[in-house]
Amino acid sequence: MNKIRKWLDKIPWYTDEIHSILMYLIMGGFTTLINIVTFWLCTYVLNWDYRIANTIAWVASVLFAYFSNKKYVFESYTPTWKERAREVTSFFGFRFLTYLVDILVMILLIEVLSINELWAKIWTNVIVLVLNYVFSKWIIFKVKK
């Protein structure tokens, strides 16, 4: 990753902010892929209820997201247990909040608007992706000056 970053840093308009957004889109893409594939497997292969499948997909993707966001997106350094505990609890707390948005939007799209489960999942992921970036950037992994 460092070799790529060094190469990208040679581009005059490539800033830390652009790097953070680009890395969030890449890692967010992987997180979304994990979420959708897990949801699809649980719903269409295992034939589980979409709410259970959504919860399992959420757990799998949030675990991946924490480590990828910490290391590659926000390059967060937490030297003390207290800082690490604050970061972990705020990350999972805000992700739980967006999980509630996720499940409520899924229910609305599927049961009220009769949208296909997989399409509902994809649209819901767009909403959740934006909310998670805002929470991560300005609250969870906020750089102290």
UniProtKB/Swiss-Prot annotation:
Residue stretches in coiled coil: none
Pfam families: GtrA_DPMS_TM
GO terms, biological process: polysaccharide biosynthetic process
Membrane topology of this protein: Multi-pass membrane protein
Superkingdom: Bacteria
An annotated GO cellular component: plasma membrane
Transmembrane portions of the chain: 21-41, 52-69, 96-116, 121-141
Principal location class: membrane
Function: Involved in the decoration of cell wall teichoic acid with galactose and glucose.
Stored PANTHER family: CELL WALL TEICHOIC ACID GLYCOSYLATION PROTEIN GTCA, PROPHAGE BACTOPRENOL-LINKED GLUCOSE TRANSLOCASE HOMOLOG
Family recorded in the similarity comment: Belongs to the GtrA family.
Protein name: Cell wall teichoic acid glycosylation protein GtcA
Natural source organism: Listeria monocytogenes serovar 1/2a (strain ATCC BAA-679 / EGD-e)
Lineage: Bacteria, Bacillati, Bacillota, Bacilli, Bacillales
